[in-house]
């Protein structure tokens, strides 16, 4: 992937794709997606890849494809280029919906080395948005060196899944100025809310940091 790529390209190093949506059409177990540095601005009119909870959640990227044990699907900052990829969500403001940037339902996935910034809130009542939402059935994933910052959203929000490893990730400078009179509610850096038998075990947060968030 590259900010100057095109989804009509073949997705090679010299002719990369531009969007996660196109990548999701073609990836399979064992594939490595290299994300070049630069800013990936998600436009306001881009439809969500999916919605959940009767349309309440506007899920920008639906990460539903799974790898296999020993053959993960990897979404990695390109190690051969300097700088970080940055996904800018500041234009995505769906009226009456919660924003989830990466909605994780797939298993055996690896995410590493990129930022998510500018995630918005549009609902004025009690609500929340999330950079990563991990749900039941999303198992054995590695989230590594991700920086989730300068927005209005929770960094990581886990409601289910087994054996997920959140490693050396940062969430910072996140504050909701819109809902509940701008009181900054529901903007944790990291939240693990696995309630109920069978919803998930073995999830580990290691080396993660959170600062200047609000709840």
Language-model features and meaning:
Residues 24-31, 64-68:
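Beta-strand repeat architectures
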Residues 30-32, 72, 153:
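A common structural microfeature
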Residues 36, 72, 76, 107-118, ...:
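Right-handed parallel beta-helix
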Residues 34-36, 157:
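A structural signal for short, well-ordered beta-strand segments and their strand-loop junctions
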Residues 15, 37, 41-127:
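Right-handed parallel beta-helix/beta-spiral solenoid domain characteristic of secreted/periplasmic
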Residues 1-22, 26-29, 37-45, 79:
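Right-handed parallel beta-helix/beta-solenoid
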Residues 3-4, 78, 90, 174:
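Generic beta-structure capping elements
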Residues 49-63, 90-102, 124-135, 150-158, ...:
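Extracellular beta-strand/beta-solenoid scaffold signature
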């Amino acid at each position: 992937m590259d900010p100057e790529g095109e989804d009509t390209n073949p997705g090679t190093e010299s002719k990369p794709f531009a969007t996660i949506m196109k990548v999701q059409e073609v990836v399979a177990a064992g594939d490595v997606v290299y994300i070049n540095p630069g800013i990936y601005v998600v436009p306001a009119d881009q439809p969500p890849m999916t919605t959940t909870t009767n349309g309440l959640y506007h899920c920008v990227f639906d990460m539903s494809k799974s790898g296999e044990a020993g053959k993960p699907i990897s979404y990695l900052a390109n190690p051969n280029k300097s700088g970080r990829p940055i996904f800018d969500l500041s234009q995505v403001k769906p009226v009456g919906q919660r924003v989830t940037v990466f909605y994780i339902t797939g298993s055996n996935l690896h995410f590493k080395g990129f930022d998510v910034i500018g995630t918005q809130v549009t609902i004025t009542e009690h609500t929340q948005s999330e950079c990563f939402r991990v749900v039941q059935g999303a198992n054995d994933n590695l989230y590594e060196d991700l920086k989730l910052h300068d927005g209005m959203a929770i960094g990581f929000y886990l409601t289910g899944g087994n054996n997920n490893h959140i490693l050396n990730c940062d969430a910072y400078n996140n504050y909701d100025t819109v809902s509940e009179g701008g009181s900054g509610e529901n903007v944790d850096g990291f939240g693990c809310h696995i309630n109920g038998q069978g919803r998930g075990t073995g999830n580990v947060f290691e080396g993660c940091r959170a600062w200047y968030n609000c709840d």
